Amino acid sequence: MANDSEPWPWPDSLDGIVAAPLSHRVLMENDRVRVLDVVIEPGAKEPPHTHKLPGVFIVIAPTRLRYFGAAGELVREYMASTEPRWFDPEPLHAVENIDSTRYHAIRIELKDN
């Protein structure tokens, strides 16, 4: 969120591991971090979901993706990069793998920010 004093507007039921369990799996979690394994099969589109926590995203197997916003609109189409990237909390979105190979990434979410 742009302003940390604003409350998170989405319910916990939209968290990636709840709303999109086929593509998000918890590898490890403690009071400081949550590590997610993110896999999107070829041709699959995730259900809309959020990520309340900021963190680092590391793509292991990049593919071509489509990123959709909260209203279901196409925001961008791109080739995922293997360069580690910082992510702020992500509002409602969905990702579609438009490639012929499996997309695989690790998301390290920081709880104490």
Question: Residues of each region from the PLM?
Answer:
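A short, N-terminal "cap"/entry segment at the start of jelly-roll beta-barrel domains
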Residues: 1-36, 47-48, 67-69, 75-89, ...
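Conformational-control "hinges and anchors"
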Residues: 40
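Glycine- and acidic-residue-biased ligand/ion/polar-headgroup-sensing regions
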Residues: 51-71
